């Protein structure tokens, strides 16, 4: 579990927030059940590195002036023009209580339908699960090797490979295999030998 040091914020002026960001830090808020919200600032590079190395659902220990709390990042705000992290939300978690999380899907295997020329469609890229913090995976592998042409894989077809449960609608589609699109020239049949194409009669 990564540990990040943070400083408590007491000045909320816009000019102060700009100074925080210009110094390479990001303002944030720590919140949770039965605790007082705590505005903080922390090193943005260290935060992004932790999330990149360990995944967005990793549990982080935040040390605010010696007071340590286990948290998860629930929201990151960025400035698209500057490509800069502007704010982060941290939820305090109870390691013995279940919580909900969104986990990225990783499709594995090559579907039989794709080998036959089909096209895979993936309308769902994250799964909603409920689990204790330590049991939340960083990705969930979904094997599609058995899917044939026109097959549809739904949440109901999945089996959890860890200590978590899916909270999505069971009928929600994860992936499907569609037949290949016919080329335009195949749809417009060529004239038979000896048959004059329409519009060329003199």
From Swiss-Prot:
Subunit structure: Part of the 50S ribosomal subunit; part of the 5S rRNA/L5/L18/L25 subcomplex. Contacts the 5S rRNA. Binds to the 5S rRNA independently of L5 and L18.
Top-rank taxon, per record: Bacteria
Protein name listed in UniProt: Large ribosomal subunit protein bL25
One of the record's GO cellular component terms: cytosolic large ribosomal subunit
UniProt-recorded Gene Ontology molecular function terms: 5S rRNA binding; structural constituent of ribosome
Protein purpose: This is one of the proteins that binds to the 5S RNA in the ribosome where it forms part of the central protuberance.
Family: Belongs to the bacterial ribosomal protein bL25 family. CTC subfamily.
GO biological process: translation
